[in-house]
Regions:
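Predominantly flavin-linked oxidoreductase catalytic cores and closely associated redox partners
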Residues: 1-128
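General beta-strand structural signal in soluble alpha/beta enzymes
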Residues: 26, 164-165
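Generic structural "secondary-structure junction" signal
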Residues: 36, 63, 134-135, 148, ...
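Short amphipathic beta-strand and strand-loop transition segments with alternating hydrophobic
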Residues: 77, 91-92, 142-149
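Flexible, glycine/charged-enriched surface loops at secondary-structure junctions
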Residues: 131-142
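FAD-binding beta-loop-beta segment adjacent to the flavin cofactor pocket
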Residues: 144-164
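Conserved small/polar residues in nucleotide/adenosyl-binding loops
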Residues: 168-169
Length: 169
């Protein structure tokens, strides 16, 4: 923290902590700064394709019992996104009249005005989705960046003295 753009120590500089151990397991998530440094330092991405990223938005809903179909999984791609933007949706029917409703937008879109949140809201206006959620109640929500590059984008999964437990570049 506190490192300036040119690499010098700024007024808020704090030395990072030392991670020491026989083995260090890194679980930093998407595009983590430590994982990025490890990939570069140990050339872990040398034999892999560049990673791709998306933004996933998910809501947990409680729906009317007569609309619930335990175990049903639905995936879609495309709409409401335009043909030059990748992404898709998911609906997972859970126990207790609950469903996850989510939408992923690939983060390589060209339109600077595109709103992944707005596209998710549009997705929920689809007649089938709107009917499913009508009379229901949103219980929780969240969003996170996800890696989408596939197996060919996974870097080498070990480095001297450690291994990732959840990492992407």
């Amino acid at each position: 923290m506190g490192i300036e753009r040119d690499g010098s120590h700024g007024p808020n500089y704090q030395r990072g902590m030392a991670l020491m151990g026989r083995y260090v397991l890194i679980g930093e998530g998407v595009r983590g700064s430590l994982a990025k440094e490890l990939i570069e330092r140990f050339s872990l991405g040398r034999d892999s394709e560049p990673q791709k990223f998306g933004l996933g938005i998910k809501e947990l809903w409680e729906i009317k019992p007569e609309k619930h179909k335990p175990g049903l999984i639905q995936h879609s791609f495309g709409w409401p996104l335009k043909s030059d933007t990748g992404g898709g949706s998911f609906i997972y029917h859970l126990p207790d009249n609950q469903v996850y409703v989510g939408f992923v937008t690939h983060l390589n879109y060209k339109n600077p005005y595109l709103s992944p949140f707005g596209e998710f809201q549009r997705f929920k206006t689809h007649p089938d989705v709107a009917e499913l959620l009508e009379g229901g109640k949103r219980l929780s929500y969240g969003a996170r960046a996800i890696s989408e590059g596939g197996f060919q984008s996974v870097p080498k999964l070990v480095f001297p003295g450690g291994a990732p437990v959840s990492y992407t570049h």
